Every structure is written in structure tokens, then in C-alpha cells.
A protein has these predicted regions:
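An anion/pyrophosphate-binding glycine-rich loop and adjacent beta-alpha core
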Residues: 266, 273-400, 471-474
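N-terminal Rossmann-fold NAD(P) dinucleotide-binding loop
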Residues: 62
């Protein structure tokens, strides 16, 4: 087998025609969203009930979209693999949601949020999309307050805000450390109302396994009932994927165990381009791994960096308890290196800094894989009660997991995989390269570039679901009325079902000696080592040599007990690992081809003398949109050139 080490620069992929966002309007960036909404064709309210829209996922993006589309009059068929829509992983989001309300009159504005997001993403996001997100952020808070979301309030009753990384204003609205939960319950109650009204047909415990494409357009999905194992087809005039990101390819992440990439990857195999798969986010404040037994990591909200101070001992190998290390022997390294932003630098920078001090031998805790997040100064300044009111549930969660009281001893934290900025390529209308297939929330790549700012995931999910998609999908439905009825007997549907059943039967037939989880752990550890916080040409080539070998071994040795006609979690897991084994290869290939450092993608060969990420704008100012050809075959790279009219690329500085 030819190894990647022997390939020439372009032998492992081909470069196709450039891709353009043809729907992006021109004119001043502040007017483009209004321009696009005016240009879009509409569907008469009386005709909307004649249209069916499939929505896959019930998190913030999917729940908001399903509720809003049904409220508009469309018939919505919605799917989630959980036993209830409110079990979506959005419920785990902690710290807050950004919005340019400027309640504190501290200099915030829509333009500043736009600027901070483009800069925070290291100039690898579209200006048009980011400005739209900043505009809509203001409306999101009004929507959520109207739903009764219990945002924190100041003494006088006004909504309270706090700061997150990469900004110098206070724009993050929050509900203690449970913001995702409260926002999701708001979307869930709106969705439940439409379910009760008969406008949304909900299918829980049902997983999408393939996309049905008819005459080049998305017309339905193949799904499996996870309780009975029954394979069914569902048809619609448009399909919306709101299935989240692909962080669980790393095995250990802060994502829920069942979060997976199957929906977006199967859509990719059917023609939807996958953009910037190497742009993955590593969160700097997570509880460190405690041993090989773990299958999940736990996030500690970025909001803690408002009042907690991050430090390590100045001396290498200092194993004294934190309380015994004097102040003058502590290195508050973020405050030292980045005095303007201190502990609130963007996530990619904070994560690399933590890795660097641990690599120097100054880490704390077991194996030296941790740094301190210390609240002693905050407690002395504000009092324990005030700290408890702001962070009490997070402190309680930390103590339950670690048996350490963070009011008395510093938290120990270390970076972990948390979010994926890459995803399905979408145009300004959030439509993929498969007409009629839309991707929203973390399932797409559109708004965050190479690094997402904290508290912007909830903002994007609700912006896409409540405001953007319900406006843009009308245009598609109005311009593409489907005259042909599609049912289970259509050749495209029959073929999609056959391929799905064959894949499941093949998994069951191998009868090997290794569990799906063992393969998931192996591929995850490989990707973390070579495509994690720091990446090198040599390491990525090693990964690309090894992944096909793991994939080949998987199909020889996988063991899936039981049958496909029953509740079978081993089969569920194996089916998802199949996708991870393909997606991991594309992630590493994308990271290898992008021979620059930007945001969360850090190539050790491309850094400044100070160790910061060094972009190569003359070569890589584009979104990399990958076209699937076949498993193990060379994909096709399509480049979408990025232009910057309002926020000109510079070397990011947070010093």
C-alpha cells in the first residue's frame, strides 16, 4: 500500500473548480441580510400546509427551526435519537449566549460583535454571514425573554451580562451555569405546542442513516427506529440537518456520548461538500482525564475565567499542594503573556498556553496534565456568597466529580475537545451543495472560521433556527415546486434502503473479536495525538497511513452481537464508528493540506517567534470544501475564496 509519506503535494486529493456563494448579496454588509430577505420569494400562507419539511435534530437549532417552520404553517416531520427532544446535547451548554444589546453601555455594538467574531475566528469566516449573526443576536434575546427564559438579572431587574474570551465588553447573557438548559426548554415548549397542534410529527428514538436524493435534490431520509430496528423512509420537499458537530470522533470530548456525525457524514457521501473539517475547537477549561476507564470529559464553563485566575508553579516538577506555593512562586501565565485580555483570551490561545506550560513540566495533578483555576481572590473580593450565586452549580458539579471543594482549593483544569467549526458547506441561505438540503447550527461551517468565541454556539443555533432558515427556505420552496410525488417505491429510495440494510447486515455478519468501542477509542486517540492541539506534517502523514489500516481491521474484527430487528446499542455504535473512520481521514487530510496555523488549527511548522499561530493569507484565505468520491479514494477540494472588506486580516494580538 502506498503511504502518504510517499505522496507528492497533491497526490492525495485533486483540486476541482472553485465554489462560490452565489446567493450572498452585495452592498454594505449591514444591509445584506435585509436585501436578501427582500429578494427571496415567499410561499403563500395558504400553500405552506401543502409542503413537508424534514428536520433532523432537536437541539437549539433544530428545536427552534421545527417550532418556527410549523408556526409558519408548514408540515414538519422531526427526528431525534434521544427519548425526548429536550435530551438534545444543547441542554449541557453552561456559560451563556452572546448578543450585542450593549445594556452596560461599555462600547458594545453590532459592528463590534461582528469584528470580534471575525478576528476571533482568525479571519477564516465569511463577513456576510458573521454580520448577519451579529444583527440577529439582538432579536434572539427578545425572543427568549418572551418565552420566559430566566436569564440572570441585576439588582434593579435588568438582564445581567458577563464577559467571555476574546472580547473586552460584557455581552454574554446567562442563566447561572445552565444557559443551554433554559434556552432549550424555551425552544422545546415552542416545539411541544406545535406537536400538540398536529403541525409537527415527532419521531423520537429514531436515527437518520441516509439521505434520499431524487434528480439531484434532497427529497427524504432513511431512518432506523432504535427500539424496534425497523428501517423506514420519510419524504419531504426539503430536508434540514440540525444534528450537531463531530467532536466525538476524538472519543474523549465534552460532547454527550451519543452525539455523532452520521447524519452530516451520510449527507456528505450523497453529495454535500464538507468544509474545513480540521477546524476543531479545544476548550481550555475542562476537568482533566482521570484514567483509561473514561469515555467522556466534563466541561467547566468559560464563564469561570471571569473571576478565576489560571496559574501553575514557576518551577518545573513542583508537586506541593497549591496552598503551600507562595504567591511569588506562581505563574499567572495568561495574565503575564496577554495583559490586555488576561484570563479571557480566546479558547485556542488559552488551550495552547495550557499545553505549553504542561509540556514544560509545570503542570499540576496526576501526570502533570492540568493547571489551576483559582477563585481565592474572587472569594476574598466578593465574598463566598456572591461567588456561589454566580457559579454554585458549576462548583457543585466539580466537587461531585473530583471530591475537591473549589471554594477551598483551586480547580484543576486541562483542555479537551468541545466543538467543531467545520461542517457541511452551506451558502448564505444555509443550503448545502445538494439542493433542498439545509444544514444549521453546528452541523454547518458558516459563522466561526477557525475558532469560535465562547457563548457564540448558542447564538448561532438560535439565529439559524428561529430567524435565518425560516426566511431562506421559503425561497427554495417557492422556486422549486415538486410536481413528482416520491414514495418508498421510488428507485432512489429503494437504493438508499438497500445500501443501509446491507451496511447493517455486514456489521452483524463479521462476528469478530473487538467491540465498536475499542475501535472508537483507537481512532480517537490517534486523531487526538496527531490532529489535536498541535499538528505537524510528519504526524498527520502517520495518521493518514494508519487510519486505512484501522478501517480494514475494523471490517475484519468487529463484533456486533444481537440482530438488527431489536434494540441494539452495539449496532448503533458500530454504525457510527464506520463514519468516524472515514471522517477522521478527511480531517487529517484537511489539516495536512492547510500548511498554516489559524485559530484552532495549529501547525507547528507555522508559528511566530513567540509561538503564536502564523497564518499564510496569500495561500490559504479560503474555505476548503471537500467533495466525497469513495471510501479511501482521493476527495476533490473546492476552494471558496474569502474576501474582507470591513475587517482586514492582521496578526491576532491579545497582549
Amino acid at each position: 500500500m502506498t503511504s502518504y509519506s510517499e505522496y507528492t503535494e497533491y497526490a492525495d486529493y485533486t483540486v476541482g473548480e472553485p465554489i462560490e456563494d452565489e446567493l450572498a448579496p452585495s452592498g454594505p454588509v449591514s444591509e445584506r441580510w435585509d436585501t436578501r430577505r427582500f429578494q427571496a420569494k415567499l410561499v403563500n400562507p395558504a400553500n405552506r400546509r401543502k409542503h413537508t419539511i424534514i428536520v433532523v435534530g432537536t437541539g437549539l437549532a433544530g428545536g427552534a427551526a421545527g417550532a418556527t417552520l410549523a408556526e409558519q404553517g408548514y408540515h414538519v416531520v422531526q427526528f431525534c435519537y434521544q427519548d425526548s427532544p429536550r435530551r438534545a446535547h444543547s441542554i449541557a451548554a453552561q456559560g451563556g449566549i452572546n448578543a450585542a444589546k450593549n445594556y452596560r453601555n461599555d462600547g458594545d455594538s453590532i459592528h463590534r460583535l461582528f469584528y470580534d467574531t471575525v478576528k476571533g475566528g482568525d479571519f477564516r469566516a465569511r463577513e456576510s454571514n458573521v454580520h448577519r449573526l451579529a444583527q440577529i443576536s439582538v432579536e434572539i434575546i427578545d425572543q427568549c425573554v418572551a418565552q420566559g427564559v430566566p436569564f440572570a438579572r441585576e439588582y434593579g431587574g435588568l438582564l445581567d451580562t458577563r464577559s467571555f474570551g476574546g472580547v473586552q465588553v460584557s455581552r454574554t447573557f446567562y442563566a447561572r451555569g445552565q444557559t443551554g438548559q433554559q434556552l432549550l426548554l424555551g425552544a422545546y415548549q415552542a416545539l411541544s405546542r406545535q406537536i400538540a397542534a398536529g403541525n409537527v410529527e415527532m419521531h423520537a428514538r429514531t436515527e437518520m442513516l441516509d439521505l434520499i436524493v431524487v434528480d439531484g435534490r434532497a427529497r427524504g431520509i432513511v431512518a432506523r427506529d432504535l427500539v424496534t430496528g425497523k428501517i423506514s423512509t420519510y419524504f419531504a420537499d426539503a430536508v434540514v440537518l440540525a444534528s450537531g458537530g463531530y467532536g466525538n470522533v476524538f472519543y474523549l470530548s465534552t460532547n454527550a456520548m451519543n452525539s455523532n456525525a452520521t447524519a452530516i457524514w451520510r449527507a456528505h457521501r450523497r453529495g454535500a461538500y464538507f468544509a474545513n473539517p480540521c477546524f476543531t475547537q479545544i476548550h481550555p477549561t475542562c476537568i482533566p482525564r482521570s484514567g483509561d476507564h473514561q469515555s467522556k470529559l466534563t466541561l467547566m464553563s468559560e464563564s469561570l475565567r471571569n473571576d478565576g485566575r489560571i496559574w501553575v508553579p514557576k518551577a518545573k516538577g513542583d508537586t506541593r499542594p497549591a496552598a503551600e506555593i507562595p504567591e511569588d512562586e506562581r505563574d499567572y501565565y495568561l495574565e503575564r503573556i496577554y495583559p490586555s485580555f488576561g484570563n479571557l483570551v480566546p479558547r485556542d490561545i488559552a488551550s495552547r498556553a495550557a499545553k505549553n506550560v504542561c509540556d514544560e513540566g509545570r503542570g499540576v495533578g496526576p501526570g502533570g496534565q492540568g493547571v489551576y483555576l483559582d477563585f481565592a481572590d474572587a472569594i476574598a473580593r466578593m465574598g463566598r456568597k456572591a461567588v456561589e450565586e454566580k457559579y454554585g452549580n458549576l462548583f457543585d458539579m466539580y466537587e461531585r466529580i473530583t471530591a475537591e471543594n473549589p471554594y477551598e482549593v483551586p480547580m484543576r483544569i486541562y483542555p479537551a475537545i468541545h466543538y467543531t467549526m467545520g461542517g457541511l458547506w452551506v451558502d448564505y441561505d444555509l443550503q448545502t451543495t445538494v439542493p433542498g438540503l439545509f444544514a444549521i447550527g453546528e452541523a454547518n461551517f458558516s459563522d466561526h472560521g477557525a475558532n469560535r468565541l465562547g457563548a457564540s454556539a448558542l447564538m448561532q443555533g438560535l439565529a439559524d433556527g428561529y430567524f435565518v432558515l425560516p426566511s431562506t427556505i421559503n425561497d427554495y420552496l417557492a422556486r422549486h415546486p415538486h410536481k413528482e410525488e416520491v414514495d418508498a417505491g421510488h428507485p432512489a429510495a429503494v437504493e438508499a434502503v438497500r445500501e443501509t440494510e446491507d451496511r447493517l447486515a455486514r456489521l452483524l455478519a463479521v462476528d469478530g473479536d473487538r467491540t465498536p468501542d475499542s475501535f472508537h477509542r483507537e481512532i480517537g486517540e490517534l486523531v487526538w495525538e496527531f490532529c489535536g492541539m498541535a499538528r505537524t506534517d510528519e504526524g498527520l502523514r502517520k495518521a493518514l497511513d494508519r487510519i486505512p489500516q484501522i478501517r480494514e481491521e475494523f471490517w475484519r474484527r468487529i463484533k456486533v452481537p444481537g440482530t438488527g430487528e431489536e434494540f441494539n446499542q452495539s449496532l448503533e455504535k458500530a454504525n457510527r464508528v464506520v463514519d468516524y473512520l472515514e471522517l477522521a481521514e478527511l480531517m487529517c487530510l484537511d489539516a495536512l493540506h492547510r500548511a498554516e496555523s489559524c485559530g484552532g488549527h495549529f501547525r507547528e511548522e507555522s508559528q511566530t517567534p513567540d509561538g503564536e499561530a502564523a497564518r499564510r493569507d496569500e495561500e490559504f484565505t479560503y474555505a476548503a470544501a471537500w467533495e466525497f468520491t469513495d471510501t479511501g479514494a482521493a476527495p476533490v477540494l473546492h476552494k471558496e475564496q474569502l474576501t474582507f472588506e470591513y475587517v482586514h486580516p492582521t496578526q491576532r494580538s491579545y497582549a
